[in-house]
UniProtKB/Swiss-Prot annotation:
Protein's UniProt name: Phosphoglucosamine mutase
Gene designation per UniProt: glmM
PANTHER family: PHOSPHOGLUCOMUTASE (ALPHA-D-GLUCOSE-1,6-BISPHOSPHATE-DEPENDENT), PHOSPHOHEXOSE MUTASE
Cofactor, how bound (note): Binds 1 Mg(2+) ion per subunit.
UniProt lineage: Bacteria, Pseudomonadati, Pseudomonadota, Gammaproteobacteria, Vibrionales
Keyword vocabulary terms for this entry: Isomerase, Magnesium, Metal-binding, Phosphoprotein
Keyword Transmembrane included in the entry's annotation: no
Catalytic residues as annotated in Swiss-Prot or TrEMBL: S103 (phosphoserine intermediate)
Top EC group: isomerase
Length: 446
């Protein structure tokens, strides 16, 4: 069996709807191939959730048909955050959980990602086994062994109660006014209720999904509307979730953005204060230097993983640590959940706000973010612009200018045809001009 993946990226199979591999025929075969592999594992039962994209209906049907042909039973949750599917997969002792979502991407993209029976990303050997089955012709099981589909009507209620259970029972949100932006995505019917039931005065936005407005100028990838609303409503803070509920970005009462690095810092510092910090914190190559320095001042160990929550998780498991994060808002808290869970992460920050009687603004001041600029350059073709001489020369020149007061990172996106250029350092103007210089070199080499 080849170790090279053809379909699975860093976060499952993803692409533009209607273009290979996100087509009804491929997804049907993917369901069958996954069903063949999973059927050998045990219960022959899977949980299927999705976000609010219009294409979810089509892909859900195709996926279930493939699974049924392989003899697996599917339980549909309807629109449900990705971490909720991971949780429900565990509680129902299902063989796997499947999420139909493209997370923070626009509505015209979609994807399929899998969770193991433990609520974690599928092991590499299972993904490779599924890819091997995709090379075979579909063979339907005997009619008496075909799978069937059922619907889980109380999925949202179950997950809401789980989220609330991660918030200290001695605390309440009754003195907080919170603006909650659900990105017209999978948390729209869940997140506002979690915070309301814990006592908060909730102002909800991004809770009117129509199939094509997911992540559109709302949510964790675009917090401008939330920043404006928090200030207008004189709220204590704002919470922005992405389309599938695994990313969280916060906004303080002054309208300042609080990103994944700052959120992880607040959670780690609070755990240290309570004597409950188990080990250190895992970030990524994109984690701001300010977080690394802030943790160092507290005596908290820190390591960087490759970009992607899969790699953060690998480092956490290898070290036995419990807190990992990406600045984009993926926050993994292994003492509470098995994957990145935006609602649960938000609740831990709110527990710190209430427990310390400090504002989100004040809590986030413990670390100073370095100016950081990210430029995305779209590319196509077989050539690798990262190896182009002009790009290497531009990087070398910028690194010499920054010295030990900044850093440069170039990488290919794991989910889109993009080269990501990141520059950070103490001097904001130098950082901006340096990022543009490298991005121009990448564009010229594409």
């Amino acid at each position: 069996m080849s170790n090279k993946r053809r379909y699975f990226g860093t976060d499952g199979v993803r692409g533009k709807v209607g273009q290979y591999p996100i087509t009804p025929d491929f997804v049907l075969k993917l369901g069958w191939a996954a069903g063949r592999v999973l059927a050998k594992q045990g219960t022959k039962k899977v949980i299927i959730g999705k976000d609010t994209r219009i294409s979810g209906y089509m892909l859900e049907s195709a996926l279930e048909a493939g699974l049924a042909a392989a003899g697996l039973k599917a339980t549909f949750t309807g629109p449900m955050p990705t971490p909720a599917v991971a949780y429900l997969t565990q509680t129902f002792r299902a063989e796997a959980g499947i999420v139909i979502s493209a997370s923070h991407n626009p509505y015209y993209d979609n994807g399929i990602k899998f969770f193991s029976s433990e609520g974690t990303k599928l092991p590499d050997d299972i993904e490779l086994a599924i890819e091997a089955e995709l090379d075979k012709d579909i063979e339907c099981v005997e009619s008496s062994e075909l799978g069937k589909a059922t619907r889980l009507n109380d999925a949202a209620g179950r997950y809401i109660e789980f989220c609330k259970s991660t918030f200290p029972s001695t605390l309440s949100l009754s003195n907080l006014k919170i603006v909650v932006d659900c990105a017209h995505g999978a948390t729209y019917h869940i997140a506002p209720n979690v915070f309301k039931e814990l006592g908060a005065d909730v102002i909800a936005m991004g809770v009117e999904p129509n199939g094509i407005n997911i992540n559109e100028e709302v949510g964790a990838t675009d917090v401008r509307a939330l920043q404006k609303r928090v200030v207008e409503e004189q709220a204590h803070l704002g919470l922005a979730f992405d389309g599938d509920g695994d990313r969280i970005i916060m906004v303080d009462h002054l309208g300042n953005k609080v990103d994944g690095d700052q959120i992880a810092y607040i959670i780690a510092r609070d755990a240290l204060r309570r004597g409950e910090l188990k080990g250190g914190v895992v970030g990524t190559l994109m984690t701001n230097l300010g977080m690394e320095n802030g943790l160092k001042q507290l005596g908290i160990p820190f390591v960087r993983a490759a970009v992607g929550d899969r790699y953060v998780m690998e480092q956490l498991l290898a070290k036995g640590w419990k807190i990992g994060a990406e600045n984009s808002g993926h926050v993994i808290l292994l003492d509470k959940v098995t994957t990145g869970d935006a609602i649960v992460a938000a609740l831990q920050v709110l527990a710190s706000v209430v427990g310390s009687d400090m504002s989100l603004h004040d809590l986030s001041q413990g670390m100073t973010l370095y100016p950081q600029v990210l430029e995305n350059v779209r590319f196509a073709g077989e050539n690798n612009p990262l190896e182009a001489q002009a790009v290497l020369a531009a990087v070398e020149e910028v690194e010499a200018e920054l010295g030990d007061k900044g850093r440069v990172l170039l990488r290919k996106s794991g989910t889109e045809p993009l080269i990501r250029v990141m520059v950070e350092g103490e001097d904001a103007e130098l950082v901006q001009s340096s990022a543009l210089k490298i991005a121009d070199a990448v564009k010229a080499s594409c």
